[in-house]
Amino acid sequence: FGMNTGVITAFADNEVGKLMEDFILQGGVDTSLIKWMETDGIGRVCRNGLNFTERGFGIRGAVGCSDRANTAISKAKPEDFDFDYIFGELGARWLHTGGIYAALSEQSCETVLAAIKAAKKYGTIVSYDLNYRPSMWSAIGGIEKAQEVNKEIAKYVDVMIGNEEDFTACLGFEIEGNDANLKELNLDGYKKMINEAAKTYPNFKAVATTLREVKTATVNDWSAICWADGEIFKAKDYKGLEIMDRVGGGDSFASGLIYGLMTTENAELAVNYGAAHGAL
C-alpha cells in the first residue's frame, strides 16, 4: 500500500536469516529493527523457523506444518528491543501483532505486552490478531494461559481481529447458537458477542473477522465483517473465489483493514479493503 512499514522480530545471524531479510526487503519493508542473534551453526543456541505447506486440491484440504522450535524470536526478551525509540523517537503510528507470537514462549508473552504497553504510552494504535493455536499454548499452560495472557493484552488493543474460536478460547466469550466444535459460525450470535466484547473492553475501536466457506481446497466463498462505533459492516461477498495459495489470507485481510482505517477512518471501506486484499 506504499506505507512506511518496518518489522520487529529476531533472526539467527546466518545465511538463512539473511535470506529471510532479503525476502522482507523485496516487499519494501524496513529491516533495521530486526534483532540479530548469535548462533552456534547447528541451532542449539537459536535458529530460524521453517514452514511447510501442502496446498491441497479438491476435497484434499491444505495442510500446514510450522517448525518453530528454538527460534530466535521465541527467545527474544523485552530488553532486546528499544520500544521507547520505536514508538517515541521514530513515532510509529500503528503496531500490529498477534496470538501466534504471544504463544511462542513465556518470553514472547512478556515481550508482546511490553511492546503494546510502550505503544500505548506514545499514542500508537494497536491491532491484534488473536489467532488461537491450541497446540502452541499447550506447552506453556494451555487454554488457561491463553486466556490469562490475551485478556491482559486485550486491555490495550484498539483493533481486535478474531473469529468465533479465537474469542471463545482466548477471551472466554460464548457465541449463542454455535455447535460445540465451532464448525459453523452463527453470524447473529457472533455479532451479539462482538457487542459484549466491546462492553467488556471499551478500548476496542473496531473488531473484525474474515468469513470463509470452504467448497474445495481451491474454491472458497470469502468475505469479512467489521464492528465499529456500535455498527457492523459486511464486505462484498466473493463467491466461488479461486485460490492458488490460501496461506496468508488472514494476514492480507488485516493489512488491508489497517490501511483502510489509517487512511480513511471509515470502517465500511476498510473492511472492503481488507476482504479484497485477502482475496488477492
What are the residue ranges of the model-derived segments?
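Alpha-helix C-terminal capping segments
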Residues: 1-5, 26, 260-264
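Anion (oxyanion) recognition and catalysis
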Residues: 25, 113, 117-121, 154
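Charged helix-capping and loop-helix junction motifs
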Residues: 80-81, 109-114, 141-151
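Conserved post-catalytic alpha-helical subdomain immediately downstream of the catalytic base
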Residues: 217, 233-280
